[in-house]
Regions:
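Elongated alpha-helical scaffolds that mediate protein-protein interactions in large eukaryotic proteins
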Residues: 1, 14-30, 94-105, 139-147
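A positional/structural detector of protein chain ends, strongest at the extreme C-terminus
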Residues: 163-166
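Alpha-helical solenoid repeat architecture
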Residues: 2-19, 79-94, 125-140
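HEAT/HEAT-like alpha-solenoid repeats
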Residues: 26, 32, 37-49, 69-74, ...
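Residues within HEAT/ARM-like alpha-solenoid scaffolds
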Residues: 2-6, 28-35, 75-83, 105, ...
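Amphipathic alpha-helical interface segments within eukaryotic helical scaffold
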Residues: 7-25, 35-42, 54-62
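C-terminal interaction modules of eukaryotic adaptor/scaffold proteins
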Residues: 97-156
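Acidic, Ser/Thr- and Gly/Pro-rich intrinsically disordered linkers and low-complexity segments
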Residues: 43-79, 122, 133
């Protein structure tokens, strides 16, 4: 599963692909798309924790994530959990991605995952994600062409590409 998640994560660096990879928003239901969100959220869901969430909040989740068996555990591999959160962070680099995650209950899943997460690196990534999901969207930030830079693990600054004025 790690190779698939890593490939998906690499693909999510292409902001223009976010509209294709997420189900259409309520505003544009006729737009063709895939729906990767359930595949990203499902490993982050713990069935017992989800059962305690309000029914109204559960209904905002993608359909595949709503009726989860109470015995379903969260992904055990911390490296995979981190990559999944980073995938969500990359989706937040476009306005469409942020709106889709908000409308489809991603916050509910990461909120519960944050409470149970023992690894500090993953909790920090979740906090960055929550800050992007909960921030106020001004008119200036609502444009898809405006860049939101999100740093993810493994993204190192290449000193050879830095131009310095002398």
């Amino acid at each position: 599963p790690g190779g698939v998640i890593r490939s998906l994560k690499n693909f999510l660096f292409l902001k223009h692909a976010h509209r294709l990879l997420l189900a259409p928003s309520a505003e544009q239901p006729d737009r063709p798309s895939l729906d990767i969100l359930p595949y990203i959220l499902m490993p982050l869901i713990d069935g017992k924790e989800l059962a305690k969430v309000d029914l109204e909040d559960q209904e905002s989740l993608p359909e595949a994530c709503q009726l989860v068996d109470e015995n379903k555990p969260r992904e055990k591999d911390s490296a995979l959990r981190l990559m999944l959160v980073e995938c969500l962070l990359l989706l937040c680099t476009s306005h469409y991605g942020r709106q889709s995650l908000r409308e489809r209950g991603a916050y509910i899943v990461v909120r519960e995952a944050h409470l149970a997460e023992p690894k500090e690196q993953i909790t920090e990534a979740i906090v960055r994600l929550v800050n992007l999901l909960k921030r106020d969207e001004s008119d200036a930030s609502m444009k898809d062409d405006q860049d939101v830079h999100v740093s993810v693990e493994g993204e190192d600054a290449d000193d050879d590409l830095v131009i310095e004025e002398l």
